[in-house]
Amino acid sequence: MKLYQYILSGAMSMGLLFSSCSDWLDVTPVDTRTTENFYTTPSQMEQALIGVYNGLLPLSTYALLMSEVRSDNTWCGELSTAQRDYMDISSFNPNISTIATVRDAWNDLFEIVSRANLFLSKVDGVNYTIEGIKEQQIGEARFLRALAYFDLVRYYGRVPLTLVPQTISEAMSTPQSEAVEIYEKVIIPDLEYAVGSLTEEPKDYLGRKSASGRATLTAAKALLGRVYLTMAGFPLYDETKKELARELLEEVIDYADATGKFWAKNASEWQRMWINENDNKYHIFEIQYIVAKDYGNPMVFHSVPRLPSKYVTLEMSGNSIACAKGLDNLLKEEQDEEGHFLDVRCLATIDTTKFVTDNPNSVTKYAGEDFFIKFLEHKMKREALGYDDINAQIVDRTYFPLNFPLIRLEDVMLMYAEIVGPTSKGVDMVDRIRRRAGIPVLTNAEKEPAAFRECVDKERRRELACEGIRWHDLVRHNNLQAVRDKFQEYAVDANGNVIRPTLLLYIRQIKDGTYLYPIPDSQMKVKEGLYVQNEAYR
C-alpha cells in the first residue's frame, strides 16, 4: 500500500495546519492552540510527518520544467506570441523572475522546509513509548528538509537559512546564506543524522511495518552521496567531498547487490518499471502518487503534446517539449540490420514511430518529433505490457498514479563509475546497464579515462532521461556549452546556413550565471534590500 493511500484522510485533515503559503515570507500565523493541542501524541506526529512528505507532490513538475527543459535533453522550439513558462526557461529568457514556475518552485520547496521545521520543533515534547520511532521520524523529517534545501541551493544558489519555525518579523529579517553554508549547516548534518537513525524497513508510530514510500537508510546514503559529488563539482569544486561520495555510493551498490533490491533483471522488466503497479519496487526513493484528486503525478500532463483518444482520453497540455536531436540520436545509435533500435530504453522513453493520428478516415503515422513517453501510461503501452487499461480512472490532469523517482540505483551506479573511472568495478557499473538495455558493452578504447568519462555521461543521458537529472549534471560539469551546441544544431542547416536566427539569440542569453535561476520577483519585493538578485538577472 502506498503512503498516501494509507494516510490520505489523515493528511487531508492536516489542511488547517499545513495550508501552503503563497509566499515564503507571506506567512499566515497558525492558531497557537491548534498547533499546541495537535502535536501531543506519536499518532499525531506521524500525521504531521506525512504532511511533510505531502510537500513532495509538485516536485516532479519542477524536475521536468526546471531541469530537463533547461538542458540539452529537450527541444521546445522558438518562442511564440503566447507566453509559456517552459519556453521562457528553455530559451534562457533573462526576464523569468516573474514566471509562475520559478515562483512556485521556491514556495513549494520552502513549504517542505517549513513543515519539517515545525515538526522538529514539536517532537521533543511528545512521549514515544516504542523504542526507535522518535529517532526514525526525526531522521525522516531531516531527510526531507535536506532534500528541499538541496534543490533550493541547486536552483537558486543563495537562499535564506532557517532551522526553526519563524514569525513574520523573523522571516523578514533573515537574509540569504551562501550555498556552501546551506550545505554545511543543513544539508550535510541533516543527512548524516538520517544515515544514523533510519533503517531499511521504516515503522509506523505503533512499531508496525510502514506503508511504502518513506525514507530509508539506503535513500539517505544515496542522497548524501549525490550531495557530496555535487559539491565536488562546479561551482564549489570541493575535491575533498569526492571520496566521501564514493564510500557512500559503494555502500548503496553493495547493499543492492547483496539483497537483489532496486534492480530490474532484464529489458522486459525495465520497461515495466514505468507502470504504476510496480511502484516502490525498483526506485531507492520516489514521490508517491495515487489515482485521486490532486494526488497524482502532475508532470505527466505537462510532458506530452495532445494525443489521439486511442492513447489517452484526457486532453493533454499540448506543450511542445520534444526530445532533442542529441539525446534522440543517442537512444537510436544502436540498430540491427533491419533498422530496429536495439536500446530498449528508446522504446520506453521516446520512441513514437508506432504512434498514429486520430483521423477517422485514415490511419496516418505521427510525423512530429519524438517526445517523452516514459511516465505516460497510455492505453497502447499498458496493453502491450499486459496491463489493464486505467484510462477511465484518469479524470483530470491530477490523477496520473505513476510514482516519480528521485533516486534510482542506476543513478548511483553511474555516479560511482564517474568517480572511480575505468576500474574493473567502474566498468562493470556501466556494462551492467548497457547489457540490460540491449546495447554492446564498452570497448577497450572506451575504457580509456577520457573516453570512459564521456561514456558515463552518455549513459546517464540515456538511462535517466526525463527524470530531472540532466541539467544538474551539466551544471556540475560546468558544461552549459552543451546547451549552446543544441541551439546551434537547430539554428544552422547542413550547409552552414542560418535557418533559425532567433536561436542565435538564445545562445547569447546563456551566460555563466544562468546555471542558477533568479530569485523570484515576489521575494525581491517583500522587503527591499533583504535579498540580492543572482548576477545574471540584475
Describe these PLM feature segments.
Residues E36, Y62-T81, T162-P165, T199-T218, ...:
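Short, surface-exposed recognition loops and adjoining beta-strand edges that mediate ligand/DNA contacts
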Residues P42, E46-L59, T81-Y156, M172-K185, ...:
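Conserved, well-structured interaction surfaces
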Residues C21-T74, N93, R103, L118, ...:
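Acidic, glycine-rich segments characteristic of secretory precursors and extracytoplasmic regions
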Residues L49, Y53, L57-S60, Q83-D108, ...:
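Elongated scaffold/linker segments in the mid-to-C-terminal portions of large proteins
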Residues M1-V30:
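Bacterial Sec-dependent N-terminal signal peptides
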